Amino acid sequence: MGRFIFVSFGLLVVFLSLSGSGADWPSDWSSYDLYCYRVFQEKKNWEDAEKFCTQQHTDSHLVSFDSSEEADFVASKTFPVLNYDLVWIGLGSVWNACKLQWSDGTELKYNAWSAESECITSKSIDNQWFTRSCSQTYPFVCKFQA
């Protein structure tokens, strides 16, 4: 009987330790490299899209990219839903006219500027970035750390 309790307790400890290492994001979000992402088809201006993202989950913002691989992952989620449409990303000079920064405060490490150069959209098929008036409306992608 003591052996049964010992084995049962051991299995319980293993189960509980593994249960916290699984998906820690909502089921309607996608994950990549410890972050969660969700494409929203509803069109909003940049400021409203950012505000909407902050209301979806703690520390959620419009998407920021640290690498081309992350941008490719987001494109793989946006293109099937939006085809060739543009989406708002978190890069903009809304709060700081001289320095572009991501809306979540991270520094700009990766960029994919088009030949054009206010608020920034990303083309869902090839990750090219385009400036657009912040008052225009586009679909958008939100991101938070899992």
UniProtKB/Swiss-Prot annotation:
Disulfide bonds join 53-142, 119-134. Residues 1-23 form the signal peptide. It is found in: Secreted. Its main location: secreted. It comes from the Eukaryota. Keywords: Disulfide bond, Hemostasis impairing toxin, Secreted, Signal, Toxin. One of its GO terms (molecular function) is toxin activity. Expressed by the venom gland. Coiled coil: none annotated. InterPro entries: C-type_lectin-like, C-type_lectin-like/link_sf, C-type_lectin/snaclec_domain, CTDL_fold. Residues 32-143 form the C-type lectin domain. GO terms for cellular component: extracellular region. Interferes with one step of hemostasis (modulation of platelet aggregation, or coagulation cascade, for example). Heteromultimer; disulfide-linked. Belongs to the snaclec family. This is Snaclec stejaggregin-B subunit beta-2. It comes from Trimeresurus stejnegeri (Chinese green tree viper).
